[in-house]
Amino acid sequence: LENKAEHDALTGLLNRQSASMRMANALERTLQRGYRGAFAIIDLDDFKQVNDRYGHLSGDTVLADVAQHLCGAFRKGDLICRWGGDEFVVYCEDMERDDIERRLVELSEGPWNATLPDNRVIELSVSTGIAMVPQDGIAFKTVYERADRALYRAKSKGKAHFCFFEADKDS
């Protein structure tokens, strides 16, 4: 029962409430241990069109596929959650900028395929905003807001882009 309360029923990932608490604790550990970390908001490109064109059952299939794809792109101990809708949040404790960048290049390099319930195959891509810890903040609210601003800039560039928070561009 506790597992159901902490996880998103559709994707099996941590849900927003559970992830918020765990990420706040992980951010505190990052500060205490002198680590660096990466906080990313990942948004599925054109997800509304999937629901509108293929139906909500297909949209659910796509979200579950994205969750699996994200689990394969990050380390086992990284916190990955479905934040809501087609938005996912990831916190990678003890990760340098070049490592998260490498993972995001792989994630963004091309669309990947998802098979819908009717066996049609569609291409998926994601856009991502990243805030680095501690340089972009330590408090959960701060890193979330900064990653969100970076995501907005990434989406303004088109599909399958990622951007790191930059104070001069994202303020």
Locate predicted features:
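Conserved long alpha-helical elements within nucleotide-processing catalytic cores of c-di-GMP signaling
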Residues: 2-6, 12-38, 45-75, 81-85, ...
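Residue-level signal for pocket-adjacent positions within structured domains
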Residues: 5-8, 45, 49, 109-111, ...
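Short aromatic/basic micro-patch
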Residues: 13, 41, 123-125
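Residues at alpha-helix boundaries and short interhelical turns
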Residues: 34, 74, 115-118, 137
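A structural signal for short, well-ordered beta-strand segments
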Residues: 39, 88, 126-130
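Cyclic nucleotide signaling catalytic output domains
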Residues: 80, 120, 127-157, 163-171
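Catalytic core regions of nucleotide second-messenger enzymes
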Residues: 82, 97, 109-127, 155
